[in-house]
Curated annotation (Swiss-Prot):
Pfam families: AdoHcyase, AdoHcyase_NAD. The gene is ahcY. This is Adenosylhomocysteinase. Belongs to the adenosylhomocysteinase family. Its cofactor is NAD(+).
Length: 440
């Protein structure tokens, strides 16, 4: 594979596609700030006290415009940061340039090879003058696993890590269960203001955007198949239904399957759906959800894509045995021996970030406000507060704070409990309003 390594002076502590895109990136960063009230409120609240002073954060998360606002919030609160992307296709090159031009070390560009992907992550582990991280901010767990496998001695200085997504949290749980987690972790994904907003409402807007940008296909009237009906699957199914698709859902969990049926979706197996669908989206976080046999059964020019974190949900490697014809960046046709073609988006990686620009700024503000609060929580923790090394969640009052910071932007006004009402249901007038096990 021809290298996509950009030409950047070795003396500079960054590597991006084109630093000349920085002005464009800065303009979009400023626009995004207005749509990210949670992060901007944290800058206002904590900008003077600098609660992250002394924190050296290694970050591995999609290098988008929205992430640029997150990064600059972390630095505004006192942290130093080194950054890479957690996906080979998700970087927005003008966003990376904007951050690099601001003097923040970033190593990311769209279209990384696997070798370049890991090289970029490695650059966040060490920096000039002996810089090493004492905090980790991750999305998907690749940086976390690298640190545990290759640099376990560095983890002695790491106070904790925060993890953004479902897949990464599963990896953390497995490490903790095996007694191999070497630093405390906060599961940001399961904050209500992340999973019930980013995963659901974010996908509801960004999935169809990615498919349309990739294919220009008419969605209305198509039969769409969504594998998985968790929060991401729910948002994906709604996205496709809102575009006029007839949506089929596949599920392994009887509760999620019943939810899908009660929403009016037809619940089927992938074996049944393969020959019926015009468009397939995986959202399970699992492996081999769409197999080569499923793809052999699909219609000519069926569209196949994934909105889960990794590219393991579709058996892409099995398709490598056939001829690939690139149509444009992140859009390929795979030609079967009988002449049938399938349209594969982003090589089975995140379609909304590979073929489009991901979730809107507003919903990412909620997710990233959780990330900043998690970093503060871990960095400011009292000795032993987050021991043993385990996977924790943010306390309910912080989850509610994140939501409250976003209400004014959408014109929402809260009702306040009277003393009698608060006493009747046994809560404080200031919250938290629900117990930790409440299912929103």
């Amino acid at each position: 594979m021809e290298s996509s390594m950009p030409d950047t002076a070795v003396a500079e502590d960054y590597k991006v596609r084109d630093i000349g895109l920085a002005d464009w990136g800065r303009k979009e960063i400023r626009m995004a700030e207005d749509e990210m009230p949670g992060l901007m409120a944290l800058r206002e609240e904590y900008g003077n006290s600098k609660p992250l002073a002394g924190a050296r954060i290694a970050g591995c998360l999609h290098m988008t415009i929205q992430t640029a606002v997150l990064i600059e919030t972390l630095t505004a609160l006192g942290a130093t940061v080194r950054w890479s992307s957690c996906n080979i296709f998700s970087t927005q090159d003008h966003a990376a340039a904007g951050i690099a031009a601001a003097g923040i070390p970033v190593f990311a560009w769209k279209g990384l090879s696997e070798e370049e992907f890991w090289w970029c992550i490695e650059q966040t582990v060490r920096g000039p003058d002996g810089w090493t991280p004492n905090m980790i901010l991750d999305d998907g767990g690749d940086l976390t696993v690298l640190m545990h496998d290759k640099y376990p001695e560095m983890l002695k200085d790491v106070r904790g890590l925060s993890e953004e997504t479902t897949t990464g949290v599963h990896r953390l749980w497995e490490m903790a269960k095996a007694g191999k987690l070497l630093t405390p972790a906060i599961n940001v994904n399961d904050s209500v203001t992340k999973s019930k907003f980013d995963n659901l409402y974010g996908c509801r807007e960004s999935l169809v955007d990615g498919i349309r940008r990739g294919t220009d296909v008419m969605m209305a009237g198509k039969i769409a198949v969504v594998a998985g009906f968790g929060d991401v699957g729910k948002g994906s199914a709604a996205s496709l239904r809102n575009a006029g698709c007839r949506v089929l859902v596949t599920e392994i969990d009887p509760i999620c399957a019943l939810q899908a049926a009660m929403e009016g979706y037809e619940v089927v197996t992938m074996d049944e759906a393969a020959s019926r669908g015009d468009l397939f989206v995986t959202a399970t976080g699992n492996v081999d959800v769409i197999t080569i046999d499923h793809m052999r059964a699909m219609k000519n020019r069926a569209i196949v894509c994934n909105i889960g974190h990794f590219d393991s949900e579709i058996q892409i490697e099995s398709l490598r045995n056939y001829r690939w014809e690139n149509v444009k960046p992140q859009v390929d046709e795979v030609v079967f021996p009988d002449g049938k073609r399938l349209i594969i988006l982003s090589e089975g990686r995140l379609v909304n970030l590979g073929n489009a620009t991901g979730h809107p700024s507003f919903v990412m503000s909620a997710s990233f406000t959780n990330q900043v609060l998690a970093q503060i929580e871990l960095w400011q923790a009292k000795p032993g507060q987050y021991l043993p090394n385990h996977v924790y969640t943010l306390p309910k009052h912080l989850d509610e704070k994140v939501a409250a910071l976003h209400l004014a932007k959408v014109g929402a006004k809260l009702t306040k409990l009277s003393d009698k009402q608060a006493e009747y249901i046994g809560v404080s007038q200031a919250g938290p309003f629900k117990h930790d096990l409440y299912r929103y």
